[in-house]
Amino acid sequence: MLRAMSSTYPLPSLPTVLVLASGRGERFAASGGRVHKLQALLGDKTVLQHTLDNVRASGLPWHLEDVGHPGMGDSIAAAVRATANADGWLVLPGDLPLILTETLHQVAQALQQHPVVVPVFQTQEGRLRGHPVGFARGCREALLALKGNQGAAPVLRTFGATELIVNDVGTVTDIDTLQDLERASALLAGRQA
């Protein structure tokens, strides 16, 4: 059963944020997690609730893709199919609870001039590519053709990707293990201090 949860933001020229929440979370379970990673508590809310709250606060249209699919490519294709009239898409895995609304706006704005936009966060170890990855409407057919576990990598190869430097550790703070959850908890506490 598909549960399409979309905002009612009135401007159709904005891209739609696709929140992907259909993965199995096997690495989290293997690390000792007792619930699905998206249902794990981070402070007083679940990981997914943090992500959705940040997306809602952005004011951008959004869609939650939470039906089980064989791979991330299948999830992206299903979400694009469900929002086929969108003016573009920001693909955001549901396990990125610290994403800033400002970053969502920056990626959306960059899509006005580039077909594919990837946020990049600078660390001491180097530059890390993160999410959400933005896709302009011209990428629609390529996104609809995605299958399997490689996500949108084929679309990035076809269209190229413009890297957008952002000051948002939330773009690279995904929750795959209990250790990731602990790290996110410390980062969240630092933001709230």
Show where each model-derived region lies.
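Nucleotide and nucleotide-moiety/phosphate-recognizing core
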Residues: 9-129, 160-168
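Short aromatic/basic micro-patch
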Residues: 41, 98, 134, 174-175
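Single, functionally critical "micro-switch" positions that shape active/binding sites
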Residues: 22, 35, 135, 175-176
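Short, glycine-/small-residue-rich phosphate/pyrophosphate-handling segment
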Residues: 128-159
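A short local structural element in Rossmann-fold oxidoreductases
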Residues: 29, 144, 185
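Active-site-adjacent beta-strand anchor residues
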Residues: 65-66, 92-93, 133, 146, ...
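Conserved alpha/beta core of the MobA/IspD/sugar-nucleotide pyrophosphorylase nucleotidyltransferase superfamily
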Residues: 2-17, 147-193
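A generic structural signal for short hydrophobic patches within well-formed alpha-helices
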Residues: 104, 139-143, 181
